[in-house]
Curated annotation (Swiss-Prot):
L-aspartate binds at residues 175, 221, 452, 493. It is found in: Cytoplasm. One of its GO terms (cellular component) is cytoplasm. Residues 199-202 are annotated as: Aspartate. InterPro entries: Aa-tRNA-synt_II, aa-tRNA-synth_II, aa-tRNA-synth_II/BPL/LPL, Asp-tRNA-ligase_1, Asp-tRNA-ligase_1_N, Asp/Asn-tRNA-synth_IIb, AspRS_core, GAD-like_sf. Gene3D superfamilies: Bira Bifunctional Protein, Domain 2, GAD-like domain, Nucleic acid-binding proteins. The record marks 33 as: Important for tRNA non-discrimination. This is Aspartate--tRNA(Asp/Asn) ligase. HAMAP family: Asp_tRNA_synth_type1. It catalyses: tRNA(Asx) + L-aspartate + ATP = L-aspartyl-tRNA(Asx) + AMP + diphosphate.
Amino acid sequence: MHPYRTHDCSALREENAGQVVRLSGWVHSKRDHGGLLFIDLRDHYGVTQIVIPAGTDLLEKAERLRVESVITVTGKVVVRHGSQRNPNLPTGDVEVLADALEVRSSAEVLPFQVAGNENYPEDLRLKYRYIDLRRDKMHQNIMLRSKVITSLRQRMIEQGFTEFQTPILTASSPEGARDFLVPARLHPGKFYALPQAPQQFKQLAMVAGFDRYFQIAPCFRDEASRADRSPGEFYQLDFEMSFVTQEDVFTVLEPVLAGVFNEFTPEGWKITDGAFPRIPYADAMRDYGSDKPDLRNPLIIKDVTDAFRDSGFGLFAKIAASGGQIRAIPAPGAGDRPRGFFDKLNSWARENGAGGLGYIIFGEEGGKGPIVKNLEADRVESIREICGLKAGDAVFFAAGKGDEVAKFSGVVRTKVATELDLIEKNAFRFCWVVDFPMYELNEETGKVDFSHNPFSMPQGGLEALNTQDPLTINAYQYDIVCNGVELSSGAIRNHLPDVMLRAFEIAGYGPEVVEERFGGMLNAFRYGAPPHGGAAPGVDRIVMLLADEPNIREVILFPLNQSGEDLMMEAPAPVEPARLKELHLALDLPKPKPTASK
């Protein structure tokens, strides 16, 4: 017999009755019933109930065991009858009557319990992550992640993609976030950077003549944590294709994502059927107030600026006259809500930096509310018609200029739909956001700058760069969004040196700057580069959605905390002066802030 196990803890069934077996695992829980001791023994695969009979030498040894101790049990499989069966366990029809028990490793008192579903402080869980990962939900999340990655990889291979690995030690990149820098000992004063993405390498692979590349790529960015963004390190399904249009990229990625979500989505959930909707960026900002629209939310924002222009409602009339916008967020069914509902949303708006949240309630005899007192009846009716509302509905307003009012109206849209319970449940709704602007106006400097990826091909090519207002030029750039979460950015790349130099020139970067910063890729394009494009869906975010977790750290094996610290390994940590000297580095640490005198 094997020294540790003949079966795993999920394997035994009624047909094993009478067999002598050996199991190893962790003591998940113990229960004492009238002299008999029951142990739930857990391993990676499942749980089996162990019975320690009364009047045996094993009982005293088993009673001394702490939960989470590791043991090996040998005994006979017996069938459980009637109410003793546990339908919640695959092994619930049998148990093992122990006749030998060996302690492999005793556990000390736990910092928190593995059994149960209590919420413990995140920092405590991360400090003892190896214990946290024993909890059933966490174990399932990490196994789901592994299966999702396997599925993604297989689906890419089936579409003719080849997996390559790109360098981890590289040069600083233009992705936008701060780099993690690694001092080069053999080259004093110089640094490698950990890649923010394999962007330039995957494009160079296309220049090298490889046609379809992918990898599950680690990416490193020194940026702040969010619920859907892990600080420091994350993984993406990075891919690139030669001789493709934007639609070719969509045709490849849609079945990969739809297939993975169909494979791992809980039963009864709905997924976007057929081709994912394509929404131009301008339309997304107009209709949803976001470039990451959540299509589970049925509300569509409407522009009602003209209804307030030269109207009796002075505040909005003034905003309209000065070039601002008034946006209406429909609230179907909200007309029956008490006054407190509207006051609560008004207070919420103020807490979020707005002056308030105006509204109109529609009844059988017209509109009601503070705005209606100073707004002509025909204008109230016009707003109702534009928004497609009826008696018993309401509408909220956001007013201001440019992107600021667009984004705030999007936040209001989400808040109103949440409060009215309008967001579709148990569904994954995908869309592409396309036609991103190539450039934007930097509000601080007043100069034109790239709005997103500087290596995207401008729509219209060199002619557009030479003849159009830069702020009217769109790029062949796209995002894929699911339930309001951006899963991926991508683009058809700018592979023509003259177009690239002109694109950077418009953004204020001379040819010498481009040559210095991106000379490796630019030179490669001078030796014959195919048209190419790709994308890079975030693996962590995909798993977060499929696991229905609100925080991305719940689907990462050993994540950093919100402050970018590894509490378990105590990183980052100071290093010895001798190591700094070896690297020719000196520290210039910030001075501690003075404490107030008493």
